[in-house]
Structure formats: structure tokens, C-alpha cells
Amino acid sequence: MSPREVTGEAAGEIRQLVPDIETLARRLADVDYLVDEGLATSIFLSLRLPQPLLLEGEAGVGKTEAGKALALVLDTPLIRLQCYDGIDAAEALYEWNYPRQLLSIRLADSRGATLGEEELFGPDYLIRRPLLRALEHPGPRPAVLLVDEIDRADDDFEAFLLELLGEAAVTIPEIGTIRATHPPIIVLTSNRTRDLHDAVKRRCLYHWIAYPTPEREVEIVRRRVKGSSDTLAVQVANAVSRMRDSDVQKPPGIAESIDWLAALSLLGVERLDAAAVDLTLGSVLKYGEDQEVIRAAGLEQLVRGGD
């Protein structure tokens, strides 16, 4: 049996909740996360094999939301680790509660006793960070562990994750190896700002999330911005698609499409026009240079393309 395998009652509950790919896609849609067949298949296999799932794609295409939606579908906690340059075990896994250790030493001294290393470096003195909390989650269903933007971390941190990814375990030098009773469902995301190590990829299922078609994007943004004009949603999706095909440095993701539609709807816009685009361009393009590219190409042209 794989050390990552979910067994017993938890496995049965997961199989009952998502018996097949179609049911998984429908349940994800119920929490307003729309997937195509490829992504639904990857998530399903990740649950059943089980194996960590590595999602790569441009910023804003919905990688992080996949982990959040999966936790909602499985009705289990989401434990999120946001990666950054320089992150290490103290932030990700654990650190020792030195003030508590010192207090215990002083208390023991006042009683004429001495605390040994095994007593001071035991589970009671651990400050549990996201990775350890996910491993020690008591169930009944495994937690969803979202390791977000792993490409922001360095090679050493990737190496540190290998034991967790491959064996659902971590080793703490003073304690030993801690193995998960309910191995977490692991979703890693990357914006591909750098290549991840092959050792990480070998331990994961891989899926690239591309930008959705304008038709799919209309469905997504309408679900996320309740009460918005149908016509406006179509125009926004098509206009954003044209922006992605232009020479902008940072193409807008789905998150920006949602923000833009929300801003336009708040202003009472029902149909997109050049004036509305000009006023709200900062909701969808976050670099001045990119805004100038779109303005130079003509806002009227952008709007006509969005009809």
C-alpha cells in the first residue's frame, strides 16, 4: 500500500462524494469552479491514485481556486502555505516554542529538577506550521494542503518537500519521522516563473491550466459576479481575450476578468464602450505600459472586438 493512500472510512466517503469524473466536475461547478474535462480528470486521478497535483499556468487562471474549491467539495479544511523567496522549515513545517521551553526550565529549576532534552524537544513544545498541521489533521477526511506559488521558493525548499510529497511524512531531527494518519490531498501551484526540479514533478500529477475560451470565461465570470448584464459579461470576456492576444507584458487572467466585470457592474454599465473601458482599465491591466499598449491600439477597436 502506498504511504499516500487514503484508507478506511475516509476513502469510502471520498469515493461516494466523487464516484466519477462527471460527478466531480458537477460538484466543482456547484461551488462556482468550472473545469474542462482535462482538469477534472487530473483532479480525479489525484484523489484516487492518490498523488499530489501540480497545477501550472499563467497568473490568474484559477490554480489557487482549484484547491479552495476541492476543499469545499470534500467538506474538509483547506490548509494553505503561501510560498515566497527564502521560506524555510520554520515557516512551513514547525519551530520550537522557545519561550515555553525556557519557562519550563525555570519552573523545573525552582523545584530542584532538571529537564532532559527528550522532554524539552517533544510534541508539546512544537509550534505547528501548515505542513505539519496538514499531516496531523485528525480527519475524518484528509485536509486539502495548498502549496501556493511554489516557484517563488528556492531549490532547497523543493528538496525539503520531497519526503512530504512522496511519503506523506516529515522528519523532525529531535523527534523522528511523523507520518500522516490521513495523508493530505496536496495541490501545488506554480506560475512557472522558473522551472521546478524534476524530483518534484516526478512525485506529482501535472496539469497546465490554459486561459479559457471566451465562451467558458463568460460562464465563469457570470457565476462570480451575480446580477451582471449578460451582454456585458460577453463583451468583457471577448475584450479580455483580445488583450491576451496583444503585446501586453502581463496578460489579464480570469481573476482580472472577474474584477473588471464587478467594477463595470458596480458603475451601472450594461454595455461596454470606449469611455467605460478608459475609466476602468486599471481593474484589468495592472501595468501602465500595458494600458498604453491597449489605448494605442484603440479602445473602440477593443470594444468592437468584444461585441
Language-model region placement:
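C-terminal regulatory/interaction module of P-loop NTP-utilizing enzymes
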Residues: 1-307
